Amino acid sequence: MKTIPSEVRCSRLCPACTNAALRLPRNAGRALIWIYRHTLSPLVGFNCRHLPTCSAYGDEAIARFGLWGGGWMTLARILRCRPWGTSGIDNVPVAKPSGATWYRPWRYGRWRGVNAK
């Protein structure tokens, strides 16, 4: 059995390992969206009322703001995408919405309107 020299082994607080651990929830959320886009979405049909589609919006929101913030943004978007709901171009915000913190997650989402301020 080979032993790995101590200078090659990852230390306990290695920055690369820490960053990988912090990206794990984000990547798991994006993986779920990828699975939906390649399995269920083709069966149901591509019929989103917004541009970009809700799954593309969710993927971008989670990539930009993490699973917690991006997940709340995606939930708000899915709730707006219904009959008699909003439609049109609705991009992911560039910056985090004002007042959005981890303990006030509802502030991440735009619950009414498209591109509302």
Curated annotation (Swiss-Prot):
It comes from the Bacteria. Keywords: Cell inner membrane, Cell membrane, Membrane. It is found in: Cell inner membrane. GO terms for cellular component: plasma membrane. It is a peripheral membrane protein. The keyword Cell membrane applies. Pfam families: YidD. Could be involved in insertion of integral membrane proteins into the membrane. Belongs to the UPF0161 family. NCBIfam families: membrane protein insertion efficiency factor YidD (TIGR00278). PANTHER family: MEMBRANE PROTEIN INSERTION EFFICIENCY FACTOR-RELATED (PTHR33383:SF1). This is Putative membrane protein insertion efficiency factor. It comes from Nitrobacter winogradskyi (strain ATCC 25391 / DSM 10237 / CIP 104748 / NCIMB 11846 / Nb-255).
